[in-house]
Regions:
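Pre-NBD coupling/linker segments of ABC/ABC-like ATPases
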Residues: 2-33
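ABC family nucleotide-binding domain
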Residues: 20-23, 32-186
Length: 186
C-alpha cells in the first residue's frame, strides 16, 4: 500500500487509504487499469486564499472514491473542479481523456460521465422519485422521457427502490433518499 500523501487540506493522493486526518480514499485493488480521472498538481485560489494545493490523484474505472476532511478543507471545491463547476488556476484535470480546463471542452457532456453524491444531496421535493432521476437526463442530456424513465427505473432497481418511484422524497426515510441520490449520480 502507498503511504498517504496529505497536503494541508487533507487531500492529495487517490491511491491511498483513509487515515486519521481524512483524505481521498480508493481501493488499491483497482477494478480496472483504465484511468478515468487524472488530476495533476491542481491548485485553486479564491482571491489570495489558496483552497487547493497541488492535488494529484488517479481514479481508475470502477473505483469508488470518498473525499473526506474537516469543514472548510476544500472537499466540495475539489469535487467541483473535477466536473468543471469551479475553475482552477494551476495543474490539469483529465476526465476520460478530456481536459476539464480546456476552453473547447463540452462541459455538459463531460459532467454526464462524472457521478457525485454529496452529504447534503438535495432531491427536488416537488418531483416524484422517478422524476428526480429523469429531469437531468431529459434537460441536460436530451434523452426522450420514456428512455430516461427506463434508465431511471433500472438504477432505482439497483438500489432496491423501484417500488418507491411514484413517491415524493418526503415520503422516504433519510437513508432511502440517499440511495435515490446515489441512483441519480449513477
Amino acid at each position: 500500500m502507498n503511504e498517504p500523501v496529505i497536503n494541508e487540506l487533507g487531500i492529495n493522493n487517490a491511491d491511498t487509504y483513509i487515515n486519521e486526518f481524512g483524505g481521498l480514499v480508493t481501493d488499491n485493488g483497482h477494478a480496472s487499469a483504465e484511468i478515468v480521472i487524472k488530476m495533476t498538481d491542481v491548485s485553486k485560489w479564491y482571491g489570495d486564499f489558496q483552497v487547493l494545493t497541488d492535488c494529484t490523484a488517479h481514479v481508475h474505472k470502477g473505483d469508488v472514491v470518498v473525499v473526506c476532511g474537516p469543514s472548510g478543507s476544500g472537499k466540495s471545491t475539489l469535487i467541483k473542479t473535477v466536473n468543471g463547476l469551479e475553475p482552477f488556476q494551476k495543474g490539469d484535470i483529465m476526465v476520460n481523456g478530456i481536459s476539464v480546463g480546456a476552453a473547447k471542452t463540452n462541459l455538459p457532456k463531460l459532467r454526464s460521465s462524472v457521478g457525485m453524491v454529496f452529504q447534503h444531496f438535495e432531491l427536488f421535493p416537488h418531483l416524484t422519485i422517478i422524476d428526480n432521476l429523469t429531469v437531468a437526463q431529459i434537460k441536460v442530456l436530451g434523452r426522450k422521457e420514456d428512455e430516461a424513465k427506463k434508465k431511471g427505473m433500472a438504477y432505482l432497481d439497483r438500489v432496491g427502490l423501484s417500488a418507491q418511484a411514484p413517491k415524493y422524497p418526503a415520503e422516504l426515510s433519510g437513508g432511502q433518499q440517499q440511495r435515490v441520490a446515489i441512483a441519480r449520480a449513477l
